[in-house]
């Protein structure tokens, strides 16, 4: 007879590791299952660091969740004794009518968040590291910064185990079923049963969820580290996390973003930057860690255009995965097939910062059938007419 658990969590990545921790903290008997080791490079959180920010340009409804996320990141730092968050401020730059600048102002005004506005000349004076087109303006959020993503997943997984959670790695979930007695999970090595099931399998969510009306689009994204020609200009403490919306600047597209440099090897070697953009849909198993010449050009292009003092030798390129919903917003809800099953997916390249609070959300949904956190806008109902 297989062991019977209170909750099984499929996918021990960003959201799943945090869910295992919050479930175990409440005394639940938890099993986390992942097809890879934890942490691993074949993931959405690969690449050392992720941005965290409060003035959320994507939609102001995320801000209450972010406030809770900040508190819970501090909580796991204190409980584990592990540094995960660096507060550097986040600088946004773009044209006034672009989505980034207008979205940042909407979020800050809606939720009364600290955020200063910079004219083009003020931006050039305060941050001479950038050479931006005439007409671009800035917004500076003091509370933002970045998280150590792989270290955070490992920290949550280890904390969950200390609290009694069991983790099975390198074990692939093949299928699941649910009835009045509970849920059953069939894996590459056997089967497991539980009262409740949480599905948060990242790029592999589509096959497990069995929801054809809610397509998930998986894309390959690259992250690069460059050794700047003038590294002294880009050190943590003097240089913020940055985000440039090039909308309106000919030949540039997507969102370019990056991080300050530090001496911590957990953050990579050099100045990290990347491009947030739709990219080409792929099957998750088609995306490997192989890199190409075009990847290097994608990393260097924004430096040539906006940060000439950061140009230099590309040190490292890494690959991560986006799992995009059709509207770019997360999907967190009860599965329509069963009250015993909840899921989180479609984090669309901007989800990691929410891992701390999403773990709590998922634990409450599984154990209580509801959550105190405001996630209504992330539900399945918005796809009812799609």
Residue ranges and their predicted role:
Residues 121-125, 146, 281, 293-356, ...:
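Flavin (FAD/FMN) cofactor-binding core of flavoprotein oxidoreductases
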Residues 49-126, 255:
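Dinucleotide-binding Rossmann-like beta1-alpha1 core, especially the glycine-rich loop
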């Amino acid at each position: 007879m297989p062991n019977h658990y209170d909750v099984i969590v499929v996918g021990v990545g960003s959201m799943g590791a945090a869910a295992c921790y919050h479930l175990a903290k409440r005394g639940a008997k938890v099993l986390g299952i992942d097809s890879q080791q934890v942490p691993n490079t074949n993931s959405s959180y690969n690449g050392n660091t992720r941005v965290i920010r409060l003035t959320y340009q994507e939609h102001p409804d995320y801000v209450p969740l972010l406030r809770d996320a900040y508190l819970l990141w501090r909580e796991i730092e204190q409980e584990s004794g592990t540094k995960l968050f660096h507060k550097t401020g986040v600088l946004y730059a773009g044209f006034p009518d672009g989505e980034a600048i207008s979205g940042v102002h909407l979020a800050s005004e809606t939720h009364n968040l600290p955020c200063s506005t910079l004219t083009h000349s003020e931006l050039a004076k305060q941050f001479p590291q950038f050479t931006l087109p005439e007409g671009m303006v800035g917004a500076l959020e003091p509370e933002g910064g970045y998280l150590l993503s792989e270290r955070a997943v490992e920290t949550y997984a280890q904390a969950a185990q200390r609290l009694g959670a069991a983790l099975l790695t390198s074990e692939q979930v093949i299928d699941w079923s649910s009835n009045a007695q509970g849920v059953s999970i069939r894996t590459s090595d056997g089967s497991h049963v539980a009262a409740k099931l949480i599905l948060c399998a990242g790029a592999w969510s589509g096959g497990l969820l069995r929801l054809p009306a809610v397509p998930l689009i998986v894309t390959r994204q690259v992250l690069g580290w460059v050794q700047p020609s003038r590294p002294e200009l880009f050190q943590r403490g003097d240089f913020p996390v940055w985000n440039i919306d090039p909308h309106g600047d000919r030949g540039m597209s997507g969102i370019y973003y990056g991080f300050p440099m530090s001496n911590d090897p957990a953050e990579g070697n050099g100045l990290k930057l990347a491009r947030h953009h739709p990219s080409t849909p792929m099957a998750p198993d088609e995306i490997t860690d192989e890199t190409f010449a075009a990847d290097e050009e994608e990393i260097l292009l924004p430096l040539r255009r906006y940060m000439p003092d950061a140009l230099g030798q590309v040190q490292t390129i890494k690959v991560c995965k986006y799992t995009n919903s059709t509207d770019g917003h997360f999907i967190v809800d009860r599965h329509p097939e069963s009250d015993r099953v909840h899921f989180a997916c479609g984090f669309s390249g901007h989800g990691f910062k929410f891992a701390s609070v999403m773990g709590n959300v998922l634990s409450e949904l599984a154990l209580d059938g509801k959550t105190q956190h405001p996630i209504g806008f992330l539900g399945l109902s918005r796809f009812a007419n799609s």
